[in-house]
Amino acid sequence: MNLILLGPPGVGKGTQAKLLIDRFGIPQISTGDILRAAVKELTPMGAKAKGYMDSGALVPDEVVIGIVEERLAQEDCQKGFILDGFPRTVPQADALGQVLSGMGKSIDHVVSLSVDKEELLTRLTGRRACANCGAGYHVDFAPSKVAGVCDACSGQLVQREDDKEETILNRLSVYEAQTAPLIAYYQAAGVLRSVDGLGTVEAVQGDILAAIRA
């Protein structure tokens, strides 16, 4: 099964991907992770990416696509994969389709997880991390025993810059601008499966499984 997970920051893609990995025994492919790995291993595409990164430039789509292609050619992807955070744009989706076609493969399902903006803000702005040991908490869903104090080391709990409302609203705006065309793209291809991400982890997982088996 070849699967793409789409959804805004905070919707729960990472959590759901882990459950799907365990169920189907296929790897999760995150572009950030494979980019770092390719650069570290100095694969042909990793070497190209390193040149851009060392100069402070954005890695162009054709190099990112090349790194994705290198990863998809590996043995553990032969029975399927879960793409998380890629593609982000219609040109990337077109390029991915061409790469997969050359391998005799295609995307089976694109699961689009959605949650309303207020819920996403609650999930993301409530995150806290220990400034000392890095332990994670949430003011609503996983609070520390003493407000603002780490259970593990008594360090101070802080809100990261990435979890502040202004930053999150900007990330959501960028996501919406990039991804709305992608949703239409995969809907037209007949592979889009829309799933409500509001619910327990188990309930959302059940809805995903039902959607891809329908």
UniProtKB/Swiss-Prot annotation:
Compartment(s) of residence: Cytoplasm
Quaternary state and interactors: Monomer.
Gene it is expressed from: adk
Catalytic reactions on record: AMP + ATP = 2 ADP
PANTHER family in the cross-refs: NUCLEOTIDE KINASE (PTHR23359)
Binding site for ATP: 10-15, 127, 199
Chief place where the protein resides: cytoplasm
Native source species: Geobacter sp. (strain M21)
Keyword Magnesium: no
Protein name: Adenylate kinase
Record: residues binding Zn(2+): 130, 133, 150, 153
